[in-house]
Every structure is written in structure tokens, then in C-alpha cells.
């Protein structure tokens, strides 16, 4: 038998790490932080084991815990003390994210990314200003152009509070361009935008909506988030956000959309982000709780696959645990 090519030669323990094509680092990771203006104590998120909402007063302590694990970047989500039809608390000077970011920026060295959307702030749970009659007519949805002004106001308020990067997530047409213009006008031309460029209307978001109290009161988000079936549409969405000035391009969710991540990496020189979402996190925990999987191993392999597909940064609820093992 003449086997000149034997790939197993490079699988021994000594050489395996030398020829590994992909590796994870703590600098690849972004940890989500949920700040809740409705509570004075930490509240565990039942559907996301190990995750919790923290009051504004605990936000710095929470970020310090993440930093001690080795993760330097966070993304902040807010749960406001009150909601209304237009989501006005989202851009309030004394809003939950604004107050938390001021504290975190002043007292830690964390790199602070802020999520820019309206779903946590509207009493209807949708990601923008509603068209007239949308709460009773399923043919109606979010008013795209009216929502753009709100997103620009939110972004500017986060910038004023000290955010290091703005991350619009609503899948509203034109959101990146409008936010870029608003930031530039206010003197924040050097503040980068990480766009949720290809965000699908996914069943994997369930636990997050519990965590952030942002589930729609009626209907769904099919009219503005992408159809999971569409890859060509993802390319179009990504191209539009790149043209409008996005500095980082994100795919959400991550694991079911690695084909989109890989194509984005091939086609663009922008940094690529992927969001390892709550459902991806929760299902691994559920399987591990049944004894079917080893959680540390499958978490590492899942994030490694996202990195291998082409992601430069990964937003993940596994950030702290993985960082400690790395």
C-alpha cells in the first residue's frame, strides 16, 4: 500500500496546536449586559442559565466581573422603568442605558457597545414607530421612515453618554445612513457603527425577549426582519449597510447562518461580527442539563465554528465562561 499523503501525521498531540487553522481569543468576544431600571437587585434570567439583569447601580460591578474573566468588550441592553407607544425613554438623557454607560465609561476600561433599537422601550414591543392602525390590522407594520428619526436620537444620546460603538439592530431600511449623519452632525464622526446587517426573523430569539422584556404585544417582526430562507437578500442588506457607512457588519443569529457569515467574510474587508444568540445558548444548556452534552466542549466548538466561518468578533453569553477556560 502506497500512502504518501497521510493527514494523520499532523494530528499528534505535539503538532496539532501548531497546525491549527483557527483559535479563539478573549479579544474575539463581546459579552451582553442587561441593565434593568425596574429592579434594585440582580434578577436571574430563567431561560438563560447563568445570565441576569442588573440594576443601574450594579452595572459597573457586573462589567468588572466580565473584565476579571478576561473579556474587555460589552454590549449594553436596557430595560426601562416605563414604556410608551413611541419608545421615548430610549433617547432620554436619564434613560437606563445612558445612565449605565456614563457609570461604566467613567469607572471601567471596558469597550462599551450599545444596542440601538426601540423594542424594549415601546409598549407594543415592536422595533419602531407603528403605522396607524397596525395594532389591529396585520397588513400594517412599523413605519420605516418615521422610525429613522427615533433611531438617530437614540444613537446620539448613547454617544453623548460615552458609548464607544453604536449597534443599530432594528433592520429598518436606511438606519445606518441616518445614524451616521446624526453622529457626524453632533461631532461624533469618529464613533463607529456596528450594523446588524443581516438579522433574520428567527425562532432562536425567544429567551432574549424574556431577558430584555421586548416581545411584541401583537403580531411578529416578519415585515422588517429578514426571511431565514434568503441568502441573496442577506447579500443585498449587507451591501446597503456597507454603502451607508457601517464600520462593522453583523450576522444574527450565528450558528444557523454560518453560510452568510462565510460569504460576508469572502466579499467584504469590513470586520465581521456574529451574534451567538440566546436560543443557541439555551439549547446547549438544556442538553447539558440532561447529561447529553458536555457544555464546556460544545460551547467552545460552537464559537470556534463561528470564528472559522469568518467572524472577527462574537457576541455571546458564553463569553465569561469561555474566557476563563482560555
Please provide the spans of the model-predicted regions.
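Alpha/beta enzyme core
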Residues: 30, 37-326
Amino acid at each position: 500500500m502506497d500512502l504518501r499523503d497521510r493527514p494523520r501525521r499532523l494530528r499528534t498531540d505535539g503538532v496539532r496546536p501548531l497546525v491549527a487553522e483557527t483559535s479563539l481569543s478573549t479579544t474575539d468576544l463581546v459579552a451582553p449586559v442587561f441593565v434593568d431600571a425596574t429592579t434594585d437587585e440582580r434578577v436571574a434570567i430563567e431561560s438563560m442559565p447563568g445570565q441576569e439583569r442588573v440594576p443601574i447601580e450594579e452595572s459597573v460591578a457586573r462589567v468588572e466581573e466580565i473584565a476579571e474573566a478576561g473579556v474587555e468588550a460589552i454590549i449594553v441592553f436596557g430595560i426601562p422603568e416605563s414604556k410608551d407607544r413611541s419608545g421615548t425613554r430610549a433617547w432620554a438623557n436619564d434613560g437606563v442605558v445612558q445612565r449605565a454607560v456614563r457609570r461604566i465609561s467613567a469607572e471601567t476600561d471596558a469597550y462599551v457597545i450599545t444596542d440601538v433599537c426601540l423594542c424594549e422601550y415601546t409598549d407594543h414591543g415592536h422595533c419602531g414607530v407603528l403605522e396607524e392602525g397596525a395594532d389591529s390590522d396585520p397588513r400594517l407594520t412599523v413605519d420605516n421612515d418615521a422610525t429613522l428619526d427615533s433611531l438617530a436620537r437614540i444613537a446620539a444620546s448613547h454617544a453623548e453618554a460615552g458609548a464607544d460603538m453604536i449597534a443599530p439592530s432594528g433592520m429598518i431600511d436606511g438606519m445606518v445612513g441616518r445614524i451616521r449623519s446624526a453622529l457626524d452632525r453632533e461631532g461624533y464622526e469618529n464613533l463607529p457603527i456596528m450594523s446588524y446587517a443581516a438579522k433574520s426573523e428567527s425562532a432562536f430569539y425567544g429567551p432574549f425577549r424574556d431577558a430584555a422584556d421586548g416581545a411584541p404585544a401583537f403580531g411578529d417582526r416578519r415585515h422588517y426582519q429578514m426571511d431565514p430562507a434568503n441568502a441573496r437578500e442577506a447579500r443585498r442588506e449587507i451591501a446597503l449597510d456597507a454603502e451607508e457607512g457601517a464600520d462593522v457588519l453583523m450576522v444574527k443569529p450565528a450558528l444557523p447562518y454560518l453560510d452568510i457569515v462565510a460569504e460576508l467574510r469572502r466579499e467584504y474587508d469590513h470586520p465581521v461580527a456574529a451574534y451567538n444568540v440566546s436560543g443557541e445558548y439555551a439549547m446547549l444548556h438544556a442538553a447539558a442539563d440532561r447529561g447529553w452534552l458536555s457544555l464546556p466542549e460544545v460551547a467552545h466548538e460552537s464559537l470556534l465554528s463561528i470564528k472559522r466561518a469568518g467572524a472577527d468578533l462574537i457576541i455571546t453569553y458564553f463569553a465569561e465562561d469561555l474566557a476563563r477556560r482560555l
